[in-house]
């Protein structure tokens, strides 16, 4: 079953402390990691900046991305890959995700209070 992962992040002070050259080197490393993940069937659907004008917009983070992968195992490998890049050293980060379910199933769970 396909899994989807939404990442949310903002800069840490450690990111701001890097020189532009260091940031560029890190960005290149992230680009390579994204390519490796794509070859493993993990694909990005895109990256974005949080739209603060959106009704009830998430205020805790500045950026987001969404990923699609074939299984929970692929998701776990993805998260290990993110950690291996050093991403969490430079960004406050939270994840949201799981397999997509039908609206009917999730609404029924709400009715049951689950």
Identify the meaning behind each predicted range.
Residues 65:
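Conserved, mostly hydrophobic/aromatic
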Residues 87-100:
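Conserved short beta-strand edge segments in small beta-sheet-based binding/regulatory domains
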